[in-house]
């Protein structure tokens, strides 16, 4: 009996040590779980913030500038704008301003994701239907084509910058009705013509005939022509071989490279 009591006393520290280890492990597990839950919560909060920002963009930037098209508003609510900007620019994705997606380099100008409010007005002006075949000029990172994918039948996006074209292809991988073509912006994509709509994602000094010739009879080209305060949103319509031009509203939009008017020399 005495031996048994001595063995129990000798074993007591070991049992206490085991219990301490168990409690410590429980504490570590609880801390790990707490941190994991917090990380997941932060992720959910980030998603909720983007969703909330998207809704605020529609309510406070688009509706307030007379964008009333249900299909256009739904497209802006559906497509995550933050997925089409660089990581460091994601907090700026839903501010009503242009967002730089490619810095200027080697003589090439910077490229931008268009400010939401003029972009939405231009898409509304385009009056896209589910049967339309759309050609976007200047795909950039793919955001505008993603919007068109929600309201058009087929979308072809042309981008001449190889880095941006690769980025657009990756961003649009799950948009099954969109294809990205790498090539000259002002050449368009004649192999896929004619198009119901050609949309130029940036302002231009002049619209080349090479693009207008790719319109279907009754098709239209939507763009912003001119720079700064003199820029106007325009729709060019092809009817029986004749192009008509209509001016709609002022729009300040970043220029797209390759559409400068040829300069005339005066002697």
Residue ranges with predicted function:
Residues 32, 42-133, 151, 164-166, ...:
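Class I SAM-dependent transferase core
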Residues 7-9, 15, 22, 34-35, ...:
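Basic polycationic patches enriched in arginine
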Residues 29-32, 43-54, 195, 213, ...:
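SAM/dcSAM-binding transferase cores
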Residues 6, 81-84, 177, 220, ...:
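Generic structural signal for secondary-structure transition and capping sites
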Residues 123-244:
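Conserved nucleotide-cofactor-binding alpha/beta core module
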């Amino acid at each position: 009996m005495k031996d048994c009591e001595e063995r129990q006393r000798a074993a007591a520290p070991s049992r206490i040590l085991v219990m301490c280890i168990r409690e410590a492990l429980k504490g570590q597990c609880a801390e790990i779980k707490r941190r994991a839950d917090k990380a997941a919560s932060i992720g959910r909060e980030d998603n909720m913030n983007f969703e909330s920002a998207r809704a605020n963009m529609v309510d406070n930037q688009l509706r307030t500038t007379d964008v009333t098209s249900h299909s256009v508003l739904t497209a802006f609510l559906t497509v995550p704008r933050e997925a089409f900007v660089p990581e460091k620019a994601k907090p700026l994705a839903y501010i009503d301003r242009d967002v730089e997606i490619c810095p200027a380099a080697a003589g090439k100008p910077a490229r931008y994701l268009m400010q939401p409010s003029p972009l939405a007005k231009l898409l509304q002006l385009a009056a896209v239907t589910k049967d339309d075949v759309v050609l976007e000029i200047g795909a950039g990172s793919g955001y505008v084509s993603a919007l068109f994918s929600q309201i058009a039948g087929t979308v072809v996006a042309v981008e001449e910058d190889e880095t941006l074209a690769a980025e657009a292809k990756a961003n649009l991988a799950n948009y099954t009705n969109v294809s990205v073509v790498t090539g000259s912006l002002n050449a368009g994509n004649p192999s896929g013509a004619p198009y119901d709509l050609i949309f130029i994602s940036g302002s231009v000094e002049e619209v080349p005939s090479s693009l207008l010739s790719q319109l279907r009879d009754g098709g239209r080209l939507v763009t912003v022509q001119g720079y700064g305060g003199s820029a106007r949103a325009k729709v060019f319509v092809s009817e029986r071989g004749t192009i008509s031009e209509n001016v709609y509203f002022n729009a300040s939009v970043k220029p797209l490279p390759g559409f400068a008017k040829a300069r005339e020399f005066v002697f």
